[in-house]
Amino acid sequence: MTGPIVTLRDITAETVRTICDLEPYEAQSGFVAPNAVSIAQAHFNPAAAFRAIYADEEPVGFIMWRPWDDSASCFLWRFMVDGRHQGKGYGREAIALWLESLQAQGYRFARLSYLPGDRGPHGFYLAQGFRDTGETRANGERLMELVL
């Protein structure tokens, strides 16, 4: 018996409210912006792309990315799995799907930033193959990179 199939899907007028209602655990809320804010920001950044994360037919998370400062890298701008759906492998599978799509588009690097802290995403990203670059942004976020 296999688990649910994880997919990345467009967010539509019919699904946007459901996606905006997804939230990480309360203790994680300071690490990622609400999905509604992310979707609004993406509409003002023509290079941004975003998708809902589904497990079978159930929305379980959100992912957003954009090209980095060079043409070889793509930046994971936002990533979240609803608290009710964490620990089921959906996040790991969603990142794998995203990385596969980057490779298919010719990117050579995936980059992201995170805020350090308890219950933060650092360990999760390490487990997906990302490595710390040693760089820290002005807002305190630390950068990670994965060679595709």
Regions of interest found by a model, annotated:
Residues 125, 130:
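Conserved active-site tyrosine of GNAT-family acetyltransferases
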Residues 3-77, 81-84, 95-97, 101, ...:
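Acetyl-CoA-dependent GNAT
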Residues 145-148:
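Short beta-strand-to-coil "C-cap" segments at the C-terminal boundary of structured domains/repeats
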Residues 102-114:
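Conserved GNAT acetyl-CoA-binding A-motif
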